[in-house]
C-alpha cells in the first residue's frame, strides 16, 4: 500500500481529540530561532478559533496551534489545522488560506523541517489517536508533494 494511502487510512480512522494537543515544551508559545536555519513560532488558537496570517483569517481547531514559519530561502508561510482536522497553509500574496494536498487530517501542527539551500522543506503534523507525526515535503520546482509520510 502506498505511503499516501496508509496515511489517508490512518487519518480517516482517527477521531477528533479536542482536549488533546501535540506535546510542547511551552503551552503558550514555542519558538525556534537560529540565524542559519528555519525559524518558526506557534500561536495558540483562541476560543473563537479565528486567527489571521499575512492578513488572511482562518478558523482553526480549538486546542491547536497555528505555526508561522520564516523560511530561509522562500516566502514565509503559516500552517494550521481547521475545525474539520484538514491541514491548511497561507503565505504572502496567496489570496487566502489553501488546503494542503494529500487529504491529510491531523490534530495539531508539530514543527517545520529545515529548508535546504535548494528550497526543499517540510511541515510535520501530529495525530492524537495514534500519537504519530506525519510530514509533507516541498520539492522545488514542483511545490508541495501532496503526499504525507511518517515523520
List PLM regions with ranges.
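Secretory targeting and sorting signals
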Residues: 1-23
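A structural motif
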Residues: 22-151
